């Protein structure tokens, strides 16, 4: 599994690096330069915008290029509570720091109902409603995305709009989001190298109605403190295939979680997942909670302190079933109630056990 994820990650990095070796290098088709209150958007030798509006400069540069062409935003600035839109086939590099405000229901950057959009590099600051917002995308590639936020939600794939397919992400680093770092709905075919979440209010990575997913590392520190959320959460029929089955199709190489709320959380008829390894310590809520989930395998790893490892079920859904957990658990408890169907435990360490 680890080898497979490394191969997938290498392929993703190759996809990103073939666009450019570093942000803004080479010969972008359009650029945004300037500082302070003066910005220029250029395409080739022609200026397509000159003025004080940073967002307008970026949008003018994007609107000036065609599918397959690239914009490099070299300048740093603020777009305020506004939105940048990226059309099909365009490549957007945010080399400078793009500071954003909160536009209710919208992303600071959006790509909706598009094919082949790439964002190889982005640095974002501020307090967005959504930092990046997507729906109806196909062959979307996100590369090195860094968000140093003071609130809001990092990356959001919408619930009530068109589904997405073949989404690839490189290294996503989100600090300070008030909600989730990365939240998905309705993706078939998802590859993520790494999600790093620091001081995030809700989830590090939240997968919902997402199938055929391969994730390398989910790394959370002080994620979801004081809440029922988790560094890594699967919810709302995540991993359930169109057939209704939970054949394994969600693969996660490793989850690391320190402090915060829960470490790993599966809920609301999700499943079909294999987690190769966990490293969980001092979680304020459950280190692991699997509740009404089906065909989940945790192949190994460690739990140290924190809230209990728990298998549970609510009355409104079928009881949890076909679960296999292999762990070393210390300074904690392992609790199964109500009893799952076809439950396989392999627990070492000094944990107290209350299982069926």
Task: List where the protein language model places each region.
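Fungal secretory targeting signals
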Residues: 1-21
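Right-handed parallel beta-helix/beta-solenoid
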Residues: 21-60
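Intrinsically disordered, low-complexity Ser/Thr- and acidic-rich flexible linkers and loops
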Residues: 160, 234-246
């Amino acid at each position: 599994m680890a080898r497979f994820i490394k191969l997938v990650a290498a392929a993703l990095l190759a996809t990103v690096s073939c666009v450019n070796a570093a942000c803004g290098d080479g010969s972008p088709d359009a650029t945004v330069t300037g500082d302070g209150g003066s910005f220029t958007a250029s395409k080739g030798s022609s200026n397509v915008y000159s003025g004080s509006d940073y967002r307008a400069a970026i949008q003018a540069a994007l609107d000036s290029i065609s599918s397959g062409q690239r914009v490099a935003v070299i300048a740093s600035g603020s777009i305020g509570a506004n939105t940048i839109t990226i059309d099909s086939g365009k490549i957007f590099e945010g080399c400078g720091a793009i500071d954003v405000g909160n536009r209710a229901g919208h992303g600071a950057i959006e790509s909706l109902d598009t094919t082949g959009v790439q964002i190889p590099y982005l640095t974002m600051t501020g307090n967005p409603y959504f930092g990046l917002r997507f729906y109806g995308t196909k062959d979307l590639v996100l590369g090195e995305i860094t968000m140093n936020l003071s609130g809001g939600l990092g990356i959001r794939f919408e619930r009530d709009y068109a589904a997405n397919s073949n989404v690839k992400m490189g290294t996503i680093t989100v600090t300070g989001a008030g909600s989730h770092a990365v939240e998905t709905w309705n993706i078939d075919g998802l590859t993520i190298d790494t999600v790093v979440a620091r001081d995030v209010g809700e989830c590090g990575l939240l997968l919902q109605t997402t199938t055929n997913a391969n994730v390398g590392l989910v790394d959370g520190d002080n994620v979801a403190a004081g809440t029922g959320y988790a560094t890594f959460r699967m919810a709302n029929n995540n991993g359930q295939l169109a057939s209704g089955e939970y054949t394994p199709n969600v693969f996660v190489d490793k989850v690391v979680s320190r402090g915060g709320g829960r470490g790993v959380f599966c809920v609301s008829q999700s499943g079909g997942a294999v987690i190769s390894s966990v490293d969980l310590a001092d979680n304020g809520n459950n280190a692991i909670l699997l509740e009404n989930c089906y065909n989940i395998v945790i192949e190994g790893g460690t739990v140290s302190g924190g809230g209990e490892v728990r298998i549970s079920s609510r009355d409104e859904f079928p009881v949890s079933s076909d679960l296999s957990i292999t762990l070393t658990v210390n300074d904690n408890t392992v609790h199964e109630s109500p009893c799952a169907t076809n439950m396989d435990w392999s627990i070492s360490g000094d944990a107290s056990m209350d299982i069926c």
